[in-house]
Design a protein with these regions (language model features):
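Active-site cores that bind ATP or allylic diphosphates and position pyrophosphate for catalysis
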Residues: 105-245, 251-256, 305-315
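Short, surface-exposed acidic
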Residues: 71-73, 226-229, 276-282
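N-terminal Rossmann-like or analogous alpha/beta NTP/dinucleotide-binding catalytic cores
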Residues: 1-115, 206-224
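A general structural signal for well-ordered secondary-structure junctions
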Residues: 69, 97-98, 116, 120, ...
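Short, surface-exposed, polar/charged, turn-prone segments marking secondary-structure boundaries
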Residues: 35-37, 67-70, 103, 174-176, ...
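Non-catalytic terminal extensions that flank enzyme cores
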Residues: 1-16, 34, 39, 134-136, ...
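Short, structured secondary-structure boundary patches
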Residues: 58-66, 92-96, 116-126, 248-254, ...
Length: 315
């Protein structure tokens, strides 16, 4: 079995790519290139109701503008439905999933009220069902999703954030892997995709740390080898909240339209990760020799209007 390093960039066309996305992509790309590995690109467009027309093409153009190249063809999730269906069938056969007819309001009313910022934990209302019960529900015309049975919560060592342990039984509980609309949920799709694409290292934002134990359970249930994970801090505004419209227009398309050079933005992001002494123009490929995951600050990078003005963007 090959031990070659393979990383990935996985933009979602549910909206435009912004400076925060660019920083995470840069770290992921450098991690793979500095390790002598390859980089794959996947368009995560499985959440079709939220997809913005033209956003996928724009995301790829933004990656090229940043100087982040990739290997092989671009993978698009909406062309891979048979792979996800096969994975679901495997989970059914080993009784790791069950049909769930609960609506969001059902769950909210049945579950104990979470503390601020916490996820509602599924109370297990439909957990008594087996995969074979789906046929009767279909005959009765009852819509249902498929939930994965959470029996334990695997700990993992994050390449950046260190040891992680999340008790899924009290932080979400049994989770959806297939939506009632007939499409795979994020957790199942990314596991199937990363395994099929040969991804060995996933570098992404630390807001996705809670997703990792769920994905590790899926890897185990499907008999797949999981990649290594590195979750890096996000980019936030001056108020400490993750980038949004309230912080002004931080879309890469807006920076490009304003005449910002890609080297200027890459230099700013490289400086924010500790690879440069000051935010000076530099190409992404010139940072490969300077890349060190451990130099990235543990706290989120605060993007201010002053920093944007310094690279020629008034917002």
């Amino acid at each position: 079995m090959s031990t070659a390093l393979t990383g990935r960039l996985a933009p979602s066309p549910t909206g435009a790519q912004h400076v925060g996305n660019a920083r995470t992509y840069l770290v992921a790309w450098l991690a793979a290139r500095a390790g002598g590995g390859t980089v794959r690109v996947r368009i995560e467009d499985i959440d079709s109701p939220r997809i913005k027309p033209g956003a996928a093409e724009q995301a790829l153009d933004d990656l090229r503008w940043l100087g982040l190249d990739w290997d092989g063809e671009v993978v698009t999730q909406t062309t891979r439905l048979p792979l996800y269906e096969a994975a679901l069938e495997t989970l059914k056969q080993v009784e790791q999933v069950y049909p769930c007819t609960c609506t969001r309001s059902d769950i909210a009313s049945a579950a104990s009220a979470p503390h601020a910022g916490e996820e509602v934990t599924y109370p297990g209302t439909c957990a008594h069902r087996s995969a074979m019960d789906a046929g009767a529900l279909q005959r009765d015309g009852k819509p249902f999703a498929w939930r994965f049975r959470v029996a334990d919560s695997p700990a993992f060592t994050d390449l950046f954030a260190g040891e992680q342990q999340i008790d899924l039984r009290h932080a979400g509980g049994d989770f959806v892997v297939w939506k009632s609309a007939g499409t795979p949920a994020y957790q199942l799709a990314v596991v199937v995709d990363d395994a099929a694409m040969g991804v060995t290292e996933v570098v992404r934002g630390d807001d996705l740390i809670p997703s990792t134990p769920r994905q590790l359970l899926l890897y185990r249930a499907l008999g797949l080898a999981p990649p290594a994970f590195a979750h890096v801090p996000l980019v936030v505004g001056a108020d400490g909240r993750r980038l949004a419209k309230r912080h002004g227009d931080t879309r890469l398309a807006a920076l490009r339209s304003a005449g910002v050079k890609p080297e200027a933005l890459v230099g700013l992001l490289g400086w924010s990760c500790g690879w440069l002494d000051r935010p000076e123009p530099v190409r992404a490929c010139d940072l490969i020799a300077r890349f060190r995951l451990e130099t990235i600050p543990k706290r989120p990078f605060v993007l201010t209007a002053e920093l944007l003005r310094a690279i020629g963007y008034a917002g």
